[in-house]
Every structure is written in C-alpha cells, then in structure tokens.
Amino acid sequence: MANIKKGDLVQVITGRTQAKGGDRGKQGKVLSVLVERNRVVVEGVNFITKHVRVGQTQRGSKTGGIETVEAPIHISNVALVDPESKKPTRVGFRTEQVEKDGVSKTVRVRYAKKSGKDL
C-alpha cells in the first residue's frame, strides 16, 4: 500500500522558499502518482513551460504555442498534510478487523502520525 495516493493533500517540504521563487511550503492535491519513477504530480506546484508545435487534432482545429504544465516532483520532497491540523505529517499503517457478511477480514488502514486520524 502506498503512502501517498491520487487525491491526497500534500505539502512540498524541500527546495527553494516561496520568497525566492520556489515551491517549498506550497500545498496541493496529488493529480497522479508515477510509481515506477517514484514521482508525483501536484496541482499548482513545479510549473514548467512547454512549447507545443502547431498541428492538427482529430477535430481539425490547430493548437500550439507556449503552455505551462505541472511537472513531476520526487515523492521524497513532499509530505502528506494532516487533515486535522493542516500541517505536514508522516503516514502510518495499522491493521483493523472488518466484518462483512459474517466474514472477518484484516485490512490495512493509513493514518496520520501526528493526530492519529484515518486518511
């Protein structure tokens, strides 16, 4: 089970400060997780300018120009945000017994280490 999943709220914990034009301290929602590259794409963080060539799409319209998109950031540079205190926290796992239709099942649950709340 992964520590960070799509849709989680994370905070950038390394890099240049916002005063110097960096992204450290910014919070955003995880748009996608690239497991094989150990990277995540975070909404509103790590923008790059991408030059797109003018070409035809399936609908026949021509698009192109310069656009800004979020680039992946290494998973070790972000921390999950505690839903209670809105501050970065570590992720823990605990096993719980869940009974469904008379069958007992063991399930791993993610929780915030600072507050102990389930994620």
UniProtKB/Swiss-Prot annotation:
Keyword check for ATP-binding: no
Keyword set, alphabetical order: Ribonucleoprotein, Ribosomal protein, RNA-binding, rRNA-binding
UniProt key word rRNA-binding: yes
A Pfam cross-reference name: ribosomal_L24
GO cellular component: ribonucleoprotein complex; ribosome
Family annotation (CDD domains): KOW_RPL26
Molecular functions per Gene Ontology: rRNA binding; structural constituent of ribosome
One record GO biological process: translation
Coiled coil: none
Cystine connections: none
Function: One of two assembly initiator proteins, it binds directly to the 5'-end of the 23S rRNA, where it nucleates assembly of the 50S subunit. One of the proteins that surrounds the polypeptide exit tunnel on the outside of the subunit.
Summary of subunit composition and partner proteins: Part of the 50S ribosomal subunit.
Entry similarity comment: Belongs to the universal ribosomal protein uL24 family.
PANTHER family cross-referenced by the UniProt entry: MITOCHONDRIAL RIBOSOMAL PROTEIN L24
The protein's name in its UniProt record: Large ribosomal subunit protein uL24
Organism name: Clavibacter michiganensis subsp. michiganensis (strain NCPPB 382)
